[in-house]
């Protein structure tokens, strides 16, 4: 399934989506920003089910998605969010 994600991070030089759907790979899913102060966006591929993810800002700070529920079981010890993907 393709899932769009949007993140506001004004002043950030880079934002990457990391999560169990990409094995927390810090290079697999760089986001694009539209305009100098626009939101960062990406569409990720994730199988149906529950996924845990976060945004990696400027290569050093993990931030949970403020638009999604927080994860309770943090396998990686980071603040993270939950993404539920349902089959069509």
Each language-model region and where it sits:
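Aromatic-rich carbohydrate-binding modules that target alpha-glucans
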Residues: 2-50, 59-86
């Amino acid at each position: 399934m393709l899932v769009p994600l949007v993140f506001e991070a004004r002043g950030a030089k880079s934002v990457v989506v990391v999560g169990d759907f990409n094995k927390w790979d810090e290079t697999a899913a760089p986001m694009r920003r539209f305009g100098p102060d626009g939101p960062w966006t990406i569409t990720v591929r994730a199988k149906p089910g529950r996924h845990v993810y976060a945004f990696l800002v400027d290569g050093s700070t993990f931030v949970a998605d403020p638009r999604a529920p927080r994860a309770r079981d943090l396998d990686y010890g980071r603040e993270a969010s939950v993404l539920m993907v349902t089959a069509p």
